[in-house]
Amino acid sequence: RESFAVQVVRQLFPTWSSIDVARIREEDEQTILLLLTEGVDILRSVGQVFSTAAFDGMMMPGSPTVKVGLSIDSNLVEISPIADEVPMNEVGALLNSYRRNRRYHRFKDGTFVDLKNADLHELDQIVTDLDLDEQQIDSGRITIPGYRAFLLDAQVDDDGKSESFVDYV
């Protein structure tokens, strides 16, 4: 059993040595993900595993959802990405990971989020149709001419539309 545990540690920690602490480089996202998604469970099968709150928080529970809010102000449509669990200044990077069909996205704070069941389709469609870039998305509020409201009306669920937007359309 002990030899199996040593083999598991060698697989999970590429810089492992018998005289030093097992480590994973911070830049090695694939190995970190392997440890978070499968490695801890494998280690638990051969012994007790203790972890810190910081380690346990490296994997965001669930999948991210980013909805789109629409409102009208001075004949301009305001588009606001609404994401409770995603930092607003990282929505663009999250969308880029989603578009590249990555299984996971890593936020600037080091937290990973599973994109397998991410609900980003609505935002992706609007960003594509309006040819918006990551910086515009990260700003939190995008303003476009009012005549484009009719295009957006069909793409966004009614619960994302303000009363001013519904009245305008």
Give short role names for the model-derived ranges.
Residues 1-169:
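Accessory nucleic-acid engagement and inter-domain coupling regions
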